């Protein structure tokens, strides 16, 4: 509400001389000295008229509260969405973590059971061949270690050379769940399946060695999948293995391979940090490790 001064009226009325005459002299006692006139003067009467007008005017406080109220509502809505997103992300991570752990234990348990039934079935009714058992376990370890050197050689001599047309998909942003480079995982799985099949259904030292070799290739492939596809390229959550110091170092070394700072080195995976240090990339490796630690901590704090 505001009162506006809309009209000011001023009226000037002349003094009526007819009311005064010589017959009626003005007594000086009637008026005080301050109001005595020397002769007749015109008397001015000032009339001021005020018209009060109501104006509809919003309070400044109301105007200020409107944007604050709007901002507050948007902030509350945004905070609510962020909380829901964080809760959903936390739930998904926990689910994937359980799935990763259960699948790891599942595959490992199946491998142990296959070894147990292979020997119990093959040796049923006879003596256990210590040599065959030792050969199976030795070949499983040897095949797993040998696959690291095979992967290093094939990566450098084949995938980055004659088979680059297929492997190039791995060095480009992936579109979809799969890439052409995944064919190499299938080609490595075929001999492992063949060796396991032959070794499981046949008796003797040679079938035992084949079974061990197939088992070693399988275990290497499973470890490669979790570290390379999961930890390095984040194709799926890997859970607590992301915080294992050496595996973090392995992931950092492989990340340098994709930056091409040392002419593609390292070409191996699990021995990649050693390759990087041999070409003088220890400092760059430490920087990449620090970067990954910061990213991991940031992701953990926001989850």
UniProtKB/Swiss-Prot annotation:
Main location: plastid
Tissue: Expressed in leaves, flowers, stems, roots and siliques.
A single Gene Ontology CC term: chloroplast membrane
Chain segment of the transit peptide: 1-52
Enzyme class: oxidoreductase
Short sequence motif Histidine box-3: positions: 228-233
The entry's keywords: Carotenoid biosynthesis, Chloroplast, Hydrolase, Iron, Membrane, Metal-binding, NAD, Oxidoreductase, Plastid, Transit peptide, Transmembrane, Transmembrane helix
Domain Fatty acid hydroxylase intervals: 143-270
One annotated GO biological process: xanthophyll biosynthetic process
Motif interval(s): Histidine box-4: 254-258
Membrane topology: Multi-pass membrane protein
InterPro entries, sorted: BETA-OHASE-like, Fatty_acid_hydroxylase
EC id: 1.14.15.24
Residue stretches spanning the membrane: 96-116, 130-150, 180-200, 206-226
Record has Transit peptide as a keyword: yes
Phenotypic consequence of gene deletion: No visible phenotype when grown under normal light conditions; due to the redundancy with BCH1. Bch1 and bch2 double mutant has no visible phenotype, but lower levels of beta, beta-xanthophylls and increased beta-carotene and lutein. Cyp97c1, bch1 and bch2 triple mutant is paler and smaller than wild-type.
Gene Ontology terms, MF aspect: beta-carotene 3-hydroxylase activity; hydrolase activity; iron ion binding
Domain notes: The histidine box domains may contain the active site and/or be involved in iron binding.
Family: Belongs to the sterol desaturase family.
Protein task: Nonheme diiron monooxygenase involved in the biosynthesis of xanthophylls. Specific for beta-ring hydroxylations of beta-carotene. Also has a low activity toward the beta- and epsilon-rings of alpha-carotene. No activity with acyclic carotenoids such as lycopene and neurosporene. Uses ferredoxin as an electron donor.
UniProt name for this protein: Beta-carotene 3-hydroxylase 2, chloroplastic
Originating organism: Arabidopsis thaliana
Classification lineage: Eukaryota, Viridiplantae, Streptophyta, Embryophyta, Tracheophyta
């Amino acid at each position: 509400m505001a009162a506006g001064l809309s009209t000011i009226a001023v009226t000037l009325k002349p003094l009526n001389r007819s009311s005064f005459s010589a017959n009626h002299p003005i007594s000086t006692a009637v008026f005080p000295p301050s109001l005595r006139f020397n002769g007749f003067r015109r008397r001015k009467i000032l009339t001021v008229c005020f018209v009060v007008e109501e104006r509809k005017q919003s309070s400044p406080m109301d105007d200020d509260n409107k944007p604050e109220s709007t901002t507050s509502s948007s902030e509350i809505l945004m905070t609510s969405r962020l909380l829901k997103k964080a809760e959903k992300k936390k739930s998904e991570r926990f689910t994937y973590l359980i799935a990763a752990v259960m699948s790891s234990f599942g595959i490992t348990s199946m491998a142990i059971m296959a070894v147990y039934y292979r020997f119990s079935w093959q040796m049923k009714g006879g003596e256990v061949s210590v040599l065959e058992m030792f050969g199976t376990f030795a070949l499983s370890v040897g095949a797993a270690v040998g696959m690291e050197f095979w992967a290093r050689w094939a990566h450098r001599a084949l995938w980055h050379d004659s088979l680059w047309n297929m492997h190039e998909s791995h060095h480009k942003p992936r579109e979809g769940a799969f890439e052409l480079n995944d064919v190499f995982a299938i080609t490595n799985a075929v001999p492992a399946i063949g060796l396991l099949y032959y070794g499981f259904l046949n008796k003797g030292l040679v079938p035992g060695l084949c079974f061990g070799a197939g088992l070693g290739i399988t275990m290497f492939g499973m470890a490669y999948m979790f570290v390379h596809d999961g930890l390095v390229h984040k194709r799926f959550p890997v859970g607590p293995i992301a915080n294992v110091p050496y595996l973090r170092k392995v992931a950092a070394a492989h990340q340098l391979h994709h930056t091409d700072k040392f002419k593609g080195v390292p070409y191996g995976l699990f021995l990649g940090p050693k390759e990087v240090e041999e070409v003088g990339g220890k400092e760059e490796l430490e920087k990449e490790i620090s970067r990954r630690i910061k990213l991991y901590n940031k992701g953990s704090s926001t989850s």
